[in-house]
Amino acid sequence: MNPRLQDSYDEFDRQRRVDEPAKSAVLPGTGTEHRTDFARDRARVLHCAALRRLADKTQVVGPREGDTPRTRLTHSLEVAQIGRGMAVGLGCDPDLVDLAGLAHDIGHPPYGHNGERALNEIAKAFGGFEGNAQNFRILTRLEPKVLDATGRSAGLNLTRAALDAVTKYPWQRGDRTKFGFYGDDMAAAWWVRDGAPAERPCLEAQVMDWADDVAYSVHDVEDGVVSGRIDLRVLADDDAAASLARLGAEAFPTLAPDDLLAAAERLSQMPVVSQVGKYDGTLGASVALKRMTSELVGRFANAAITETRSVAGGGALHRFVTELAVPTLVRAEVAVLKMLALQFIMSDHGHLGIQADQRTRIHEVALILWGQAPSSLDPLFAPEFVAAEDDGARLRVVIDQIASYTEGRLERVHEARSPRPLD
């Protein structure tokens, strides 16, 4: 039997690509490792620099907007918490799903999806840019932790099951816009996916993906309400609900407009939603809003657990034993909330103007770094640029450096190296 299809995590799942030497700083008599392999994986992600940098990377609005900003880091913490709770209910290893939540956006560049778009434009002729593929590249190559026998970086050297848990799209680019591996990372990808069903994410990755959808939909709407951009009472307006349903049907072709209209109606009639009313920042309004976010997260997470259990039965569910099942009505409700954020935050005219400026800044920084490389590159990246065999590989190094930047650093590099206008 293929070891990846067995009913428990085994040595195959816990294997690391590179053998690691015993720790040398251990006090005599204290050398026993009390953590599981997956707990160690989680700790490696939690302590890595790439995760910390997410504190200055945009979720929906900028990390320096407002007094209680959500950043890519806080979003990742929320995804990890939601996913961990779901893992307990399903029988997945909680540390695996937790670390997948922590790492699921670790490859995001400055300005979130907008920065991703800009870097994809720059790298279009050389394999493109995709945040999920960058996740894998960071974890298996770019984040310094372990060296292989040739002295090359093996990234964090996570276990096979951990890397698979972070992989939402287990395929190369091809003609698809969403993908999980760049061409020059395929040796690591083949190792991770050895024996796995073709193009099927493991259950832990599916749980992480749904936890991401739940956190994204609920918490981004919460931020929109607090900022005054979203008024939840629009859900009860027929015209507004119809508009959200049209948007949702375009974004999620598997959902019918009638399902989305019904979802908007259900949401509007939920007491925890209607009680938020016109948010005014008072104690009562803040408590009502927090109650809504808490109950919706629980509703969406528990629905997936219950539906999956109804299909797969009891016992521990993990890896490729089953797939995550989510009721259509719940998928529709999450889609409606996503469309609220899209329509009232991300499609705002002022927001679109800011995004255009951000993309221009990334393009200009790429030109600056490319024109002055390798001296313009950090010590981690400059040797890779020098060793690269062609322009595509050299450009990938420049892309790696830009993707690693916080928004603050990107703006400092742009300001310092851009020509200043004459007074």
UniProtKB/Swiss-Prot annotation:
Question: Compositional bias of type Basic and acidic residues: which residue ranges?
Answer: 11-22
Keywords, comma-separated and alphabetical: Hydrolase
Which InterPro entries does the entry mention?
dGTPase, dGTPase-like, dNTPase_2, HD/PDEase_dom, HD_domain, PHydrolase_assoc_dom
Q: Which GO terms describe its molecular function?
A: dGTPase activity
The protein's matches in Gene3D superfamilies, at most eight in alphabetical order, are given as:
Hypothetical protein af1432
Q: List the disulfide bonds.
A: none
- Where in this chain does the record put each HD domain? 72-217
- State whether keyword Hydrolase applies: yes
Segments for region (Disordered): 1-35
Q: Which GO terms describe its biological process?
A: dGTP catabolic process
Q: Which SMART domains match?
A: HDc (SM00471)
> Pfam families recorded for this chain?
HD, HD_assoc
UniProt cross-references to NCBIfam families, sorted A to Z = dGTP_triPase (TIGR01353), PRK03007.1 (NF002829)
The UniProt similarity line reads: Belongs to the dGTPase family. Type 2 subfamily.
Protein name (database record): Deoxyguanosinetriphosphate triphosphohydrolase-like protein
Give the originating organism: Mycobacterium sp. (strain KMS)
